[in-house]
Structures are given as structure tokens and as C-alpha cells.
């Protein structure tokens, strides 16, 4: 079925309002019983895109704090590769937006400081919620229950990594001081046009997994605003965002996609891949045959001063 026809069908008001819910329930039941080899075919990808459009049209965006330590290992591997050539004892300016409970910023700092303990890493960790930021600042986590997060923060760590990152006391763990040191915690809104004045230019800006929870026009304005934080020639990590929107902004602002580990990073977080096409934050399968593959699926960009 041609993609354009599917797109027009998914936008039909009658289909959205009266048919979509039962239609999606039946399709989800059938989809989850298909062999992976069938789901990977082009006709099923196109049909999945049609289903995702329906899901997206019916979904209400909401703030979400669920995350994991070492959530996307290939992404962390690329961060390690980018900081490795830096001069001995040099300063690295890092800003992590929507840092949530701290899992991402601590994962990044553990990666950087394990590889380059000599670097002076000046870190800003930012979130819009003062409540979740307090959890992050404390760096103390329950192994049995987290009040704000439904899933286990530690499910992607092995025992060696748990020992390397945390000090344990019974049913709690605390992030090790050498990882935590020197972080500047700040309640702020990524949409604030004064953000660049507040934090200055950064060598690496991480803006992962929160733009998808905004309406698209709001997300686009926010992404353009975030780009102003990146030092010319620096790097922007941005995943968890509508792929068409990200590609549009990247082209408009002249970002250079980083090709290293492109597919590995795209597929590096199994939770969002598993959720496509049934959740609005789900991530479509990597398609190397697309002509725009290198920019559509890139989630790491070198940014220059066109923002």
C-alpha cells in the first residue's frame, strides 16, 4: 500500500475518532504474534508507520522520568571516543538537559572519568522538576522501590558495573563520590531563550529522550533553542524526538551528522525500539536503504554557529 495513501488515511478525522482505538487494539494483538522476519519486511514497515501515525495522533504528551543507568551503551561508547583525543588535563564543558533522576548524567560521567580521569569536566545537570532534581543530586537509590520511576534503574548493569559505580548499604546504593563530584545542578526549562546566557557554550550538550513528550511545534522551538548552547564544532546528542522534526532542524541549521556507530546507537535502547509503533515515543526500525538514512537516524551531530 503506497505510503502517501496510508498517510492520508491516518489523518482522516473519522478514522481517528471512531475507528482508531479498536482498530489499533486488533492490530497490536496480531502484530505481536508475527515473526520478526515478517515485521522487518518493507510492506510491514510501511504499515507500521501508518499504525504509528494513528497512535501519535491519538496520544497526549506527558512528562515522564523513567530511565536506566547505562541506557544506551553505543552512545556512551561514542562519548568516550569523542573525549579521548582531548589534551591532557584540558577542560570539557558538558551540559545534560532533562537529567531526571541522574541516571544519564552519572552514566556519562562514569564513562568519561573512567577513560580520562585527567580531564576537568565542568558539568551542568538540568531538569524542569525540582523534585526529581533533588533525587538526582542526592544520588541515593533504592534497590527495591523508586517512588518516581516504575522500572528498575539498574536492569542494564552487571555486577561489576554496580560495584564500580555505587557504594551499597543494604537495600540502597549511593553513587560514588568520584563520579558525582563537581556537578552543577540547576532547575531550568530547556525552552528558555536565556539558557545560553545562563550556562554559556558547551563542548557536549545531551538532550535525550524528552522532546518526544512535547507537542511538535514546541519541540522544534526547543530543539533550535538547545542548539544555541553548543560551542561551534561541539557535539549535540539528541534522541527521543520525532525523526522528521530532528532531520528538518538539522538540515536547516547545517548540523553535521556523526556517522560513527549510527545504527548501533539507533538500536541501542531496546525499550524504545520495542515500543514502536504502539507508543508515541517508539522508535522506527533502522532502514539503511533510505536515501536520507545518514541524517534521519543520526542522533549525534557536530554543530556550528548557524543556530
Could you tell me what each predicted segment is?
Residues 101-118:
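Conserved SAM-binding loop of SAM-dependent methyltransferases across substrates and taxa
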Residues 141-172, 248-298:
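Conserved Class I S-adenosyl-L-methionine
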Residues 98-100, 127:
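Conserved S-adenosyl-L-methionine
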Residues 212-214, 244:
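A short His-aromatic
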Amino acid at each position: 500500500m503506497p505510503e502517501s495513501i496510508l498517510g492520508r488515511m491516518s489523518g482522516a478525522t473519522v478514522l481517528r475518532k471512531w475507528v482508531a482505538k479498536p482498530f489499533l487494539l486488533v492490530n497490536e494483538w496480531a502484530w505481536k504474534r508475527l515473526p520478526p522476519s515478517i515485521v522487518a519486511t518493507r510492506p510491514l514497515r510501511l504499515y507500521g508507520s501508518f499504525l504509528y501515525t494513528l497512535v501519535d495522533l491519538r496520544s497526549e504528551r506527558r512528562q515522564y522520568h523513567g530511565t536506566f543507568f547505562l541506557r544506551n551503551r553505543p552512545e556512551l561508547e561514542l562519548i568516550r571516543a569523542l573525549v579521548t583525543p582531548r589534551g591532557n588535563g584540558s577542560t570539557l564543558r558538558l551540559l545534560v538537559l532533562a537529567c531526571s533522576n541522574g541516571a544519564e548524567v552519572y552514566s556519562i560521567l562514569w564513562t568519561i572519568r573512567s577513560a580520562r580521569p585527567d580531564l576537568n569536566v565542568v558539568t551542568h545537570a538540568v531538569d524542569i522538576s525540582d523534585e526529581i532534581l533533588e533525587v538526582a543530586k542526592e544520588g541515593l537509590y533504592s534497590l527495591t522501590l523508586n517512588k518516581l520511576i516504575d522500572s528498575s534503574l539498574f536492569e542494564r548493569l552487571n555486577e561489576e558495573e554496580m560495584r564500580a559505580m555505587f557504594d551499597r548499604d543494604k537495600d540502597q546504593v549511593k553513587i560514588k563520590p568520584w563520579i558525582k563530584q563537581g556537578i552543577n545542578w540547576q532547575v531550568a526549562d530547556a525552552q528558555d531563550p536565556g539558557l545560553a546566557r545562563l550556562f554559556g557554550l558547551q563542548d557536549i550538550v545531551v538532550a535525550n529522550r524528552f522532546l518526544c513528550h512535547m507537542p511538535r511545534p514546541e519541540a522544534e522551538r526547543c530543539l533550535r533553542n538547545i542548539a544555541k548552547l553548543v560551542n561551534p564544532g561541539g557535539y549535540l546528542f539528541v534522541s527521543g524526538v520525532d525523526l522528521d522534526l530532528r532531520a528538518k532542524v538539522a538540515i536547516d541549521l547545517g548540523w553535521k551528522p556523526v556517522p560513527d556507530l549510527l545504527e548501533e546507537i539507533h538500536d541501542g535502547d531496546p525499550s524504545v525500539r520495542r515500543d514502536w509503533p504502539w507508543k508515541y515515543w517508539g522508535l522506527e526500525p533502522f532502514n539503511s536503504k533510505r536515501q536520507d538514512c545518514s541524517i534521519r537516524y543520526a542522533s549525534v551531530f557536530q554543530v556550528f554557529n548557524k543556530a
